[in-house]
Amino acid sequence: MAVSPKINRREHILQCLATMLETNPGQRITTAKLAAEVGVSEAALYRHFPSKARMFEGLIDFIEESLLSRINLIMTEEKDTMKRCQLLLQLLLIFSERNPGISRVLNGDALLGENERLRSRVSLIFSKIETHLKQILREKTLREGKGFNLDEAILANLLLAIAEGRIAQFVRSEFKQKPTEHFDQQWIFIQQQLLQS
């Protein structure tokens, strides 16, 4: 597969890695298979990335930058607590649905047998998302003078667990059960429960 000189080789390698994660669910990706997919030698891969772990770090960097930059936009543009929570969870679910291979990284499935540092990086991304959810829920008390009957940290953890569960179902179903399926109806129920608390 010839790559146009205009395409950044590093980006092309990462795109191929994400595609392979999508098209080979449950399988481990070797550098030999990746090199064949990219159309270069393994040595050429290592000219752009010193290790396979660095390739996964490149995907994790993309995940973090994509999600957190959009979360910051939600935080800036939307002031309603429930709408912020909904948009943040939808962002995570839509991002996963549009990037099935990357969902395997988020879920940890693609990182089995890889460097522990990679799983820690993904955990850190989820911790940052949970922190944003806590902040959103705590700001409701400050803005409206009325909070929730349950600690905001517990609620934030529950909301994130719902999204993570949907991503896990998506990966487990080999990308057939979409993370966004029924989310709108589920959110109505979740919101009612949150507002009653």
Curated annotation (Swiss-Prot):
Source organism, top-level taxon: Bacteria
Primary localization class, coarse: cytoplasm
Keywords in alphabetical order: Cell cycle, Cell division, Cytoplasm, DNA-binding
Domain HTH tetR-type: 7-67
One family name in Pfam for this protein: TetR_N
PROSITE patterns named in the record: HTH_TETR_2 (PS50977)
DNA-binding residues (ranges): 30-49
Annotated Gene Ontology cellular component terms: bacterial nucleoid; cytoplasm
GO BP terms in the entry: cell division; negative regulation of division septum assembly
Compartmental location: Cytoplasm, Nucleoid
Entry's family note: Belongs to the nucleoid occlusion factor SlmA family.
Protein name, as recorded: Nucleoid occlusion factor SlmA
Organism: Shewanella sediminis (strain HAW-EB3)
